[in-house]
């Protein structure tokens, strides 16, 4: 990989309602507004050479990629390591309730009901980015979720993670060069090795 274009999926029906939806087996299509956002992303990418498109397992990332790359023969790879978190009992409820729990909890704590600890989520994202940077394709479009992008941007900025992060804008592109992605991986792994958050 030489460069990666990181994009949060377009607005989904559930994200428009502020719901926590991390399970891949729960359908969550784009809203009408999200479809328009994905089309606009496609217009922005129309003249950009893309050698591989990576999505998470979740429907909203795949649908965003399908619309944005319509008519283009871009190979696909589904990478579960870049899925949204598993929220446990907060799944399907207001995201704000999960965030309130996270703010009061240690980063190693698992949400009740089978959710993922934030440390485990960060480790998973680091592994996902490591797989991407090892790919032979030069330009990779990564359609994923707000959290892995937010963590990547924090890492590049040299800041520490926090339980409450601003949402990344829908269908907005962030271009990271190879060295940037390697720095992200290094920092994410360091966060997990010596968690102070």
Across the structure, where does each feature detected by a protein language model lie?
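Acidic, low-complexity terminal tails and accessory targeting/binding regions
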Residues: 1-2, 44, 77, 85-96, ...
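Generic beta-sheet signal
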Residues: 4, 138-146
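Short, solvent-exposed loop/turn segments at secondary-structure junctions
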Residues: 11-13, 59-60, 83-84, 146-149, ...
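Phosphate-handling substructures
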Residues: 28-29, 71-125, 165-166, 187
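Short beta-strand scaffold positions
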Residues: 55-56, 123, 143-144
